[in-house]
C-alpha cells in the first residue's frame, strides 16, 4: 500500500471521504495486535480453517540487504541455522519433534530469506494438546533469540548452501545479478542477492555469522503471528510470559532503510547469457513512496485501488494484443508496487519474440505512450470495475472460510509492508463507495503521471546469440524520444456482449438418482445418458468446483496425429467459442468469477472449472460451448504457432532441456509416440487435425462423468434446471470408449545414459527410476509405494543433504498408475557437484537396498504414517480434495473416505520392505546423468 500522491484529484477525493484528514484504516476486530515493552509485535487470531490446527510464524524485518561485504549470504545462512540447534531444541530437535506429530519439514516447517525480510513458520500444527502449542511458541522464542550457532553445525551447513547456490545458478538468476549494478548504481540493492558469494560461504568466520545475528535479530525487528484454532487470550499471555525476559536490542543501531538514487536521464542496462532462452524487456518508472504515516489510511487505500485499475486496463490491452499473429511478444504485463523499501515503481514488461526484439521494444514504448497520451475509454474502465467488484464480493462472501495460513500472511504483510487488514466486510463496503467516484478522467491523469522520462530504467536481458539483435543504449534512448512525435491511434469505445448462448438447448430430465452415503454425494443419470455427481460442502461459501472426465486421451489418437493432438486444447481455447473470438469471450465474461478449461492427457480427456454461486450457470454454458461449438480461427492458430516458434527458438540453450528430454525418452523407451515438443514436432502439427482430434475426444458427453463440489445443493430446483438444460441438453451418442494400451513402456532392464553438455555452472544432474509392471493396482500397493517415497526422502535428507552436504535436496516420489497397464514407479532426482556425483549415486542405491534388506526404520515409518493421517484429516476440509476423491472413486473404484485411514494404519515395516523388494527385483532401473 505504499503509493505516491498521484494527483490533486485523487488527493481531493481521498480527503473528501475522510473529513479533510486522512484517516487510519481500522484493523479487523478478529485480529489482536499488541506490542511488548521490548519492541516485540504480536498478532493473534482465532480461525478454524482447518479446525484443530494453527499457524505459528515469526516475521523478521531484516534480510540480506543488511549484510556487510564479509557477510555476503549470511542472512540466508542464518535462516538455515535456525533448524540446526536452538536453546530448547538441540540439533535437529525442532524437525524431529514436529515430524513426530505429522508436521513435515519442507511443507509445514520452513523459512525464507529475501533482501529485506526473513520469515519462519510452523504450519498446520495440531492444537489438540496444550503441550504442542507450548512447544510451537517455544520454537518461535528460540528462532527469535535462541539460536546456538555451533561451529560443527555451521561447517556442516556450508555444503548445503553451496548446493543451493548451484541449483539456483541458472541464466535468469545470473542475469538478474549482473543487471542490478547497472540499474541501481551505488545502491546496496546492487550488491546483495540473498544466496551470496560462495567464497564467503566457504570461508566466513563463525563470528561473522554470530555478529549479524546479534546485531539484527531483536524484538524491535520481529513479529510473532499465531492464527488458528486457539484461545486468543491464552496465547497472548503465553507470548508475554515467554518474552518477558528478552531484552530490547540496545546499542546496535537502527535498522537502516536503503533506497535507489533518482536519475534525471534514462538508465539503459543490457545483459546477455549463453543459456538464456528469451529476451526480457523491462521499463521501471521509479516513484517516491507515500510517507509511512499515510500508508494505512483511507487516502492510501483509494490510491492503491486507482493504481490497480490503471494497471489492469493496461494489462487488458496487452492481453488483446497478444492474440494477434503480428504481436511482437510472447508475454507481457505491468504492475505497480514496491521496488525497494524506500521506492515504488510502475513496471511494464515484454518477453520479446525471437528475432523481433527491437520491434518489441518499440511496441512497448508505443503502448506506454498511447496510455500516457490518451488514457483509457469509459468501456475499458467499466470492464475492470466489474472485475474488481466481483473479486471483492467473492472475498466478502468467503470471509468466514479463509484458511489459517492466508490469515497469517495478512498479518505478516501488515507488519512488514504496512498492508492494511481492515477485514473483508469493511473493504467490500468501501470499494462499493469508491469505485463510482473513480472516473475515467481521474484515472487517465494517474496513467499520464506514471509514464515519465525522469527516474526511468530500461533493461534488456537476452540470449548471447548474434541472431538476437538489441538496440544499443543510445538507440534505446533515441527510440524513447521519437515515440512522442509519432502518430498513434486513439482507443475507441467498445460495446461488450453479455450473452454467451443466444438460445438454450431443450432441457433433458433426471432419469435416475442414486445417493452414495459413504461420500455424501448424489449421482444423477440424465435422459441423454450423461452422469452427474454432486457433493455439497461448506468449506467455501462462494466456491463451486467442476470437473468432468472420460477415458481415451492420446491413447486413441494415431501416432502421426500426436503433434496436432498436443495442440488441440490450446487451439480451441485460443480460437474462441461459437461466433466469439477468445478476446470477445474474455470481454463477455467481464465481472464473472468463472473459469472452464478442457484438457487431453495420455489416457483421459477432461474439463475443469470453477465459479461463484451466481456464476454457476455461466460455467455450465462455457462447458456446453466447449462440447458443441469449438471455433476454427486461422488467425489465432497463427498466433499460437508464432508464440511457440519463438519459445522453441532458444530451447536447447538451457542444458536442463537435454536432461529432461533424455529422461522422457527413457520413460518411453524411445517410443515413436513420445511427445517432446520441439521445432520438428511443431512443424508436423496442423490446425484442422488439431480440431479433428479435439472434436473426436469430446464427441460424446454421455461418455463423461461430471462432478460438482462446493456450495451447491442437489435439491435446489434452480440448480437442477441448470444441469438439465446445459448438461441434459447436450447431444450424445451410444459410443463409450476405454483408454487403449498404446504399448508405451519404460526402458526395460538396467539402463544407463551418461552424457555431457556445455554449461555455465558445473552441475551433475541425476535421475534414477525403478519400475515394475508386476504389481496390481490397489489402494494398499499405492499407499505402500507412497510410503517408500516418503521414507526415502527422509533418508536422503539425512544422508545426502545433511551428512554429505552433497545436494540441496533429493526429489523423491513413488506411486502406482493404472494405464496403459498397472505399474509401480519410484523416482529420485538431484543436482550436485560433479566431483561428488559417483559417491552420491552410490548412496541413492544403498538407501534403497538397506530398506530391501532390513526394512525401514520404525521412527521413519511412524512419523510418515502420522503425517499421512494428519494430511488426510486436513484435506477433508478442501473442495479440491473432494473433487479428487470423487474422480478416483469413479475412475479406479477406490473409496478414500471409507478405506484410506485403515489402509494407512495397515502399512507395516514388512509391507514396505516387501513392496520395495518386489519393485527392485522387477529389474527395471534406469539412470540418466548429465555432466559438464
Language-model features: locations:
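Flexible helix-coil linker/hinge segments at domain or subdomain boundaries
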Residues: 150, 248-252, 374-381, 633, ...
Amino acid at each position: 500500500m505504499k503509493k505516491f500522491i498521484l494527483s490533486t484529484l485523487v488527493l481531493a477525493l481521498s480527503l473528501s471521504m475522510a473529513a479533510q484528514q486522512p484517516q487510519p484504516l481500522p484493523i479487523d476486530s478478529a485480529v489482536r495486535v499488541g506490542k511488548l515493552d521490548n519492541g516485540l509485535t504480536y498478532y493473534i487470531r482465532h480461525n478454524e480453517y482447518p479446525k484443530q490446527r494453527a499457524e505459528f510464524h515469526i516475521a523478521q524485518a531484516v534480510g540480506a540487504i543488511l549484510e556487510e561485504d564479509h557477510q555476503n549470504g549470511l542472512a540466508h545462512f542464518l535462516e538455515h541455522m535456525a533448524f540446526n540447534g536452538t536453546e530448547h531444541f538441540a540439533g535437529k530437535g525442532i524437525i524431529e519433534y514436529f515430524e513426530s506429530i505429522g508436521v513435515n519439514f519442507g511443507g509445514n516447517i520452513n523459512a525464507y530469506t529475501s533482501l529485506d525480510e526473513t520469515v519462519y513458520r510452523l504450519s498446520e500444527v495440531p492444537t489438540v494438546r496444550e503441550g504442542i502449542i507450548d512447544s510451537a511458541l517455544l520454537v518461535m522464542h528460540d528462532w527469535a533469540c535462541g539460536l546456538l550457532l555451533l561451529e560443527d553445525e555451521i561447517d556442516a551447513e556450508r555444503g548445503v548452501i553451496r548446493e543451493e547456490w548451484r541449483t539456483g545458478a541458472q541464466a535468469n538468476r545470473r542475469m538478474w545479478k549482473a543487471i542490478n549494478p547497472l540499474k541501481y548504481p551505488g545502491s546496496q540493492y546492487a550488491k546483495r542477492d540473498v544466496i551470496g558469494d560462495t567464497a564467503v560461504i566457504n570461508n566466513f568466520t563463525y563470528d561473522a555469522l554470530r555478529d549479524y545475528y546479534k546485531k539484527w535479530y531483536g524484538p524491535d525487528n520481529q513479529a510473532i503471528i499465531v492464527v488458528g484454532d486457539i484461545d486468543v487470550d491464552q496465547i497472548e499471555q503465553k507470548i508475554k510470559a515467554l518474552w518477558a525476559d528478552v531484552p530490547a536490542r540496545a546499542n546496535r543501531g537502527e535498522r537502516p532503510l536503503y533506497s535507489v538514487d533518482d536519475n534525471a536521464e534514462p538508465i539503459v542496462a543490457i545483459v546477455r547469457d549463453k543459456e538464456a532462452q528469451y529476451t526480457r524487456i523491462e521499463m521501471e518508472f521509479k516513484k517516491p513512496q507515500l510517507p509511512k504515516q499515510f500508508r494505512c489510511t483511507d487516502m492510501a487505500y483509494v490510491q492503491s485501488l486507482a493504481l490497480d485499475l490503471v494497471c489492469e486496463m493496461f494489462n487488458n490491452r496487452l492481453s488483446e494484443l497478444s492474440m494477434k499473429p503480428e504481436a511482437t511478444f510472447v508475454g507481457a504485463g505491468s504492475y505497480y508496487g514496491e521496488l525497494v523499501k524506500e521506492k515504488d515503481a510502475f513496471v511494464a514488461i515484454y518477453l520479446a519474440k525471437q528475432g523481433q526484439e527491437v520491434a518489441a521494444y518499440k511496441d512497448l514504448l508505443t503502448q506506454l505512450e498511447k496510455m500516457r497520451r490518451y488514457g483509457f475509454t469509459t468501456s475499458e474502465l467499466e470492464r475492470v470495475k466489474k472485475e474488481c467488484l466481483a473479486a471483492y464480493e467473492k472475498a466478502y462472501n468467503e470471509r468466514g472460510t479463509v484458511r489459517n495460513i492466508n490469515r497469517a500472511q495478512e498479518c505478516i504483510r501488515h507488519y512488514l509492508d504496512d498492508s492494511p487488514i481492515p477485514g473483508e466486510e469493511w473493504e467490500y463496503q468501501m470499494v462499493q463507495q469508491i469505485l463510482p467516484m473513480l472516473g475515467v478522467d481521474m484515472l487517465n491523469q494517474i496513467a499520464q503521471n506514471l509514464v515519465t522520462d525522469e527516474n526511468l530504467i530500461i533493461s534488456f536481458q537476452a540470449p548471447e546469440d548474434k541472431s538476437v539483435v538489441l538496440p544499443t543504449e543510445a538507440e534505446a534512448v533515441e527510440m524513447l524520444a521519437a515515440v512522442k512525435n509519432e502518430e498513434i491511434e486513439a482507443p475507441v469505445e467498445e460495446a461488450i456482449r453479455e450473452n454467451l448462448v443466444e438460445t438454450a438447448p431443450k432441457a433433458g430430465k433426471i432419469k435416475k438418482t442414486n445417493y452414495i452415503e459413504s461420500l455424501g454425494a448424489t449421482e444423477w443419470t440424465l435422459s441423454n445418458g450423461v452422469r452427474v455427481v454432486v457433493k455439497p460442502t461448506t468449506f467455501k461459501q462462494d466456491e463451486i468446483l467442476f470437473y468432468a472426465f472420460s477415458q481415451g486421451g492420446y491413447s486413441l489418437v494415431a501416432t502421426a496425429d500426436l503433434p496436432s493432438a498436443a495442440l488441440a486444447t490450446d487451439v480451441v481455447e485460443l480460437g474462441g467459442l461459437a461466433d466469439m473470438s477468445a478476446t470477445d469471450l474474455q470481454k463477455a465474461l467481464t465481472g464473472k468469477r468463472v473459469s472452464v478449461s478442457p484438457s487431453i492427457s495420455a489416457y483421459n480427456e477432461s474439463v475443469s472449472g470453477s465459479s461463484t454461486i451466481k456464476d454457476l450457470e455461466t460455467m455450465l454454458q462455457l462447458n456446453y460451448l466447449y462440447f458443441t461449438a469449438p471455433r476454427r480461427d486461422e488467425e489465432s492458430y497463427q498466433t499460437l504457432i508464432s508464440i511457440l516458434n519463438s519459445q522453441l527458438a532458444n530451447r536447447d540453450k538451457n542444458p536442463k532441456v537435454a536432461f529432461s528430454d533424455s529422461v522422457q525418452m527413457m520413460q518411453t523407451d524411445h517410443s515413436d509416440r513420445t511427445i517432446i515438443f520441439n521445432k520438428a514436432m511443431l512443424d508436423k502439427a496442423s490446425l484442422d487435425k488439431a480440431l479433428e482430434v479435439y472434436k473426436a475426444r469430446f464427441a460424446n458427453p454421455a461418455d463423461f462423468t461430471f462432478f460438482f463440489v462446493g456450495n451447491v445443493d442437489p435439491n435446489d430446483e434452480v440448480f437442477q434446471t441448470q444441469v438439465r438444460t446445459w448438461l441434459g441438453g447436450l447431444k450424445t451418442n451410444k459410443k463409450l470408449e476405454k483408454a487403449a494400451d498404446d504399448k508405451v513402456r519404460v526402458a526395460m532392464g538396467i539402463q544407463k545414459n551418461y552424457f555431457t553438455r556445455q554449461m555455465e555452472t558445473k552441475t551433475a544432474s541425476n535421475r534414477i527410476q525403478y519400475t515394475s509392471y508386476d504389481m496390481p493396482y490397489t489402494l494398499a500397493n499405492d499407499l505402500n509405494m507412497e510410503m517408500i517415497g516418503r521414507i526415502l526422502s527422509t533418508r536422503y535428507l539425512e544422508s545426502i543433504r545433511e551428512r554429505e552436504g552433497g545436494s540441496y535436496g533429493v526429489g523423491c516420489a513413488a506411486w502406482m498408475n493404472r494405464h496403459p497397464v498397472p505399474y509401480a514407479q519410484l523416482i529420485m532426482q538431484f543436482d550436485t557437484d560433479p566431483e561428488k556425483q559417483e559417491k552420491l549415486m552410490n548412496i541413492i542405491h544403498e538407501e534403497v537396498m538397506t530398506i530391501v534388506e532390513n526394512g525401514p526404520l520404525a521412527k521413519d515409518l511412524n512419523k510418515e504414517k502420522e503425517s499421512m493421517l494428519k494430511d488426510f484429516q486436513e484435506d477433508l476440509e478442501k473442495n479440491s480434495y473432494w473433487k479428487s476423491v470423487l474422480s478416483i472413486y469413479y475412475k479406479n473404484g477406490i473409496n478414500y473416505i471409507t478405506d484410506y485411514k485403515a489402509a494407512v494404519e495397515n502399512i507395516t515395516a514388512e509391507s514396505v520392505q516387501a513392496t520395495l523388494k518386489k519393485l527392485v527385483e522387477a529389474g527395471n532401473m534406469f539412470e540418466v546423468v548429465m555432466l559438464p
